[in-house]
Regions:
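Periplasmic/ER-lumenal interhelical loops and adjacent helix-loop junctions
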Residues: 280-326, 333-336
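Multi-pass membrane glycosyltransferase architecture that uses lipid-linked
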Residues: 2-289, 325-487
Length: 487
């Protein structure tokens, strides 16, 4: 049996872009940041000594995140906060949020505990739907509702503000975890902190909980803690199903490096954690617990999915579940082939981004807050401002487009029609495909990968895969015995 060889070094390595402490300086690493730095005196010198004990990269990124929340998370929603959560306000001022309507729509304002009541009990309280999210999200909704003072003059806005505080805490955690996961590249977390689409989308729903849990799982894996990774993935999956998708990249890289033991530990701890989060609700009221899963199975093509756009343009697909699931599986298989056949072992963040992006592009619905799922993964997978902002631009076009499209039902004269809306969805799809395509290019040509290009890093978020021997195509080719040539 041949012995696996280490990953080939990228060629040619460029001059390291580091400070005295080993951190990458963005003005020496990213062309966009270098160009922008000319406004304040140009890029940092090669001998710059960064010794500030207070304004560390992490603290600066956290300040950026706080400003993003203030301007976009709070400021952009101020019209709805002051004028009411009604369709004309929410759609035409782009301040829509699910949070205030569901406060009463799911009985949270009456103190009803999610999932445990029968439909008859809910109906007696004027509530006609179970909470349609996984249990950890439902628990967050309930906790936030319990924090609303009983004498609040505007409990709906108070509930929104409480959710904003939770979302802000999750954003700060997401930024910190991204910076720590990136190791020598803490400034990459500024991509997360300064993304306007994050500020705009963070209060639409409760997705930030799952996003920060997946960011925590990435950090735990980077620190070689598979049990903690599994627990955080289990919690994330109990809040939103998508964090479980990280298991596919882990499995592929575990197979390629022959290090499947830690991957099995992640899967085991994740399954146990998810089970413990759910079992009580299953036993108390199975019908209430399964609402999320039943809705996911039965729902038709939802707003902003490729299936909805095809449908409104006269190209419906039936049965939709088969088409959507089939296309998802095809893309996952393509990613698996890429992971196993690439000339050098791909990085974990790169594969995780591709898997989540594939799921989002083929899913039956694409809500505007789903962009949050990709943001920390994008910062780790492709830490380049140009590509990140091309993707963000597409998401911003879609963000405003979906509200104008929904606004036509409140005021047809001001709303956006099918054609205009189709173009905004295509902007989101094109932006996501652009970033995914660049990441695929980096996998096929590792010398183009910003993280690996200076020859100092392999896979900072890779945990046991970082610097591991590679049993991929390059190693196989080197181990193959030479074919004798007849003389």
């Amino acid at each position: 049996m041949s012995t696996p060889r280490s990953d080939p070094a990228p060629v040619p390595p460029r001059e390291p872009t580091r400070t005295s402490r080993g951190g990458v300086l963005p003005t020496l690493d990213d062309p966009v940041v270098a160009g922008a730095s000319e406004l304040v005196g140009g890029p940092a010198g090669r001998r710059l000594l960064v010794e500030s004990r207070w304004w560390t990269p992490l603290r600066v990124c956290l300040l950026f995140a706080a400003l993003t929340t203030l301007v976009f998370g709070f400021g952009a929603k101020e019209h709805c906060r002051s004028s009411g959560w009604v369709p004309n306000n929410m759609y035409f001022h782009a301040c829509y949020s699910d949070v205030p309507p569901l406060y009463s729509g799911r009985g949270l304002n009456q103190g009803l505990f999610p999932y445990v009541h029968s439909d008859a009990v809910l109906a007696a309280h004027g509530v006609y739907s179970q909470v349609e999210y996984p249990v950890l999200t439902g628990m967050l909704m309930w906790v936030e509702a319990k924090l609303v003072p009983g004498d609040s003059k505007d409990p709906f806005t108070t509930y929104f503000d409480i959710n904003l505080l939770f979302a802000t805490a999750f954003l700060l955690g997401m930024v910190a975890l991204t910076a720590l996961t990136a190791r020598r590249r803490p400034w990459d977390a500024a991509l997360v902190a300064l993304a306007p689409a994050v500020g705009l989308a963070m209060t639409i729903n409760w997705d930030m909980l799952a996003v920060v849990l997946l960011a925590g799982a990435m950090y735990a894996w980077a620190r070689d803690r598979p049990a903690l990774t599994g627990v955080l993935l289990g919690l994330g999956t109990a809040a939103k199903l998508y964090p479980a998708l990280m298991l596919l990249p882990l499995l592929l890289l575990g197979w390629r490096t022959r290090r499947l033991g830690p991957v099995g530990a992640v899967a085991g701890w994740g399954a146990l954690t998810w089970f413990n989060c759910n079992i009580a609700f299953v036993l108390v009221n199975f019908e209430g617990w399964k609402e999320f899963y039943s809705l996911s199975q039965s729902r038709p093509a939802g707003f902003s999915s490729i299936w909805y756009v095809l449908q409104i343009n006269g190209h419906g697909f039936t049965p939709l579940n088969t088409w959507a699931s089939g296309l998802t599986v095809v893309l996952f298989l393509a990613i698996a082939v890429l992971a196993l056949k690439a000339p050098r072992r791909p990085r974990l963040a790169s594969l995780t981004f591709l898997v989540v992006a594939a799921f989002l592009l083929t899913n039956k619905v694409y809500s505007p807050q789903y962009l949050l799922w990709l943001v920390p993964l994008a910062a780790l997978a492709r830490p380049r401002w140009r590509d990140f902002w091309i993707w963000q631009a597409g998401e911003l076009v879609h963000f405003f487009g979906i509200w104008l499209y929904l606004g036509q039902y409140a005021d047809p004269k001001r709303g956006l029609g099918d054609t205009g809306y189709t173009w905004t969805v295509l902007a989101h799809v094109a932006g996501t495909l652009w970033l995914a395509g660049i990441i695929v290019r980096d996998i096929l040509r590792p010398e183009c990968d910003p993280v690996r290009a200076d020859g100092l890093d392999d896979d900072p978020a890779g945990g046991v895969f970082d610097g591991a021997p590679d049993a991929g195509p390059a190693a196989v080719a080197e181990d193959r015995p030479a074919v004798p040539v007849a003389g």
